[in-house]
Amino acid sequence: MPREIITLQCGQCGNQIGVEFWKQLCNEHNIDQEGILKNNNFLNEDRKDIFFYQADDEHFIPGALLFDLEPRVINSIQTSEYRNLYNPENMFISKEGGGAGNNWGCGYSQGHKVEEEIIDMIDREVDNSDNLEGFILSHSIAGGTGSGMGSYLLELLNDNYSKKMIQTFSVFPLLTNESSDVVVQPYNSILTLKRLILSTDSVVVIDNTSLNRIFVERLKLNNPTFQQTNTIISNVMSASTTTLRYPGSMNNDMISLISSLIINPKCHFLITSYTPITIDKHISNVQKTTVLDVMKRLLHTKNIMVSAPVRRGMYISILNIIRGETDPTQVHKGLQRIRDRKLVNFIKWNPASIQVTLAKQSPHVVSQHKVCGLMMANHTSISTLFERCVTQFDRLYKRRAFLENYKKESMFSSADGQGNFEEMESSKEITQNLIDEYKSAERDDYFTNTYI
């Protein structure tokens, strides 16, 4: 019996990533823009019903819910070549249409106002499932809708479907001192982090800073388009679900995939690495791919999609999903070579092993490389990303800068007009606790002190 997964796309970034993700899934499952299966030659080779369901006329419909507070992105989907793929009832655009103005509080409160409509949409999609396993949310934590409304969606899912898995693909903003996507992004980020910490089972962190570096260093592209950036993210999303859609002997469902990476539920933020990267006609500087080569490249800091000092921290767990022309003996040799060269620094309180799953390639997509791979890993250096979020938050908050628009929302209003920002302070404290948890995980006695 299939274990279905419902995807939620929230805000401009989340919906643009979702568009590329569904294009990728359609290609891999031989489904055209109308949802029609192109041929039945490989009908039993895959599990389309994890992400798609069939209408009465047997065309395939994505199990996707699209949310936005301004109409531009969803309107563009409705006029694109994929306009007939999605269920129009599964698209929510705010009637006000003004967006959230890059204000987490506005996005959150607008989500609360339309809670009944949102729940109806989710419940209807859940009722279409025979054996729902969980949800995947794509969003950004920087703006107003993806962060604020995205946070509200996570709380709703956690409250109403607490026994189902919740995973997110969360895009973190540029966190350099010189540049930022949105001036109030430190507030939005810290408020969203609280929900990612408390209301999810797994968060795949995608860092815009590292993506920009990968484009420049690997693809020689100084000014990538949004579509090119979103294609990389959708490739990661697609690769992470390969073993669910093309099942093999391991990690055939969401819970086994996540539980293999997350030993302590508190530390559930994952980093990724993908190789070789191909965008349009731009191919990363990789001439030959073997299992060993791909496994080594996945560990290379330049391929990791989070700006964190991976060499200084420690791996808690690693899962490699390898696709293409592979065999188990090559994997064994690759693991032995990595072990002999001491390329990985694991924490001491958990078995120091790289888990490897060999996944099937879609027969419908011609790959430019013989072997490709995705690494999903739990690594203590992710805490430095959260530290930068806290530092940027403190820099703004100590000056009480740019808080006027937040005061207009009930969560942050007060009778004296000065504003009530306990929610921000609480979010910072919870984020700091997560930072401390990851740092503690580097100690040899962490497991003993935590669980005994």
From Swiss-Prot:
GO cellular component: centrosome; cytoplasm; gamma-tubulin complex; microtubule
Record key words, sorted: Cytoplasm, Cytoskeleton, GTP-binding, Microtubule, Nucleotide-binding
Binding-site list for GTP: 142-148
Role of this protein: Tubulin is the major constituent of microtubules. The gamma chain is found at microtubule organizing centers (MTOC) such as the spindle poles or the centrosome, suggesting that it is involved in the minus-end nucleation of microtubule assembly.
GO molecular function: GTP binding
GO terms (BP aspect): cytoplasmic microtubule organization; microtubule nucleation
Record flagged with keyword Nucleotide-binding: yes
Full protein name: Tubulin gamma chain
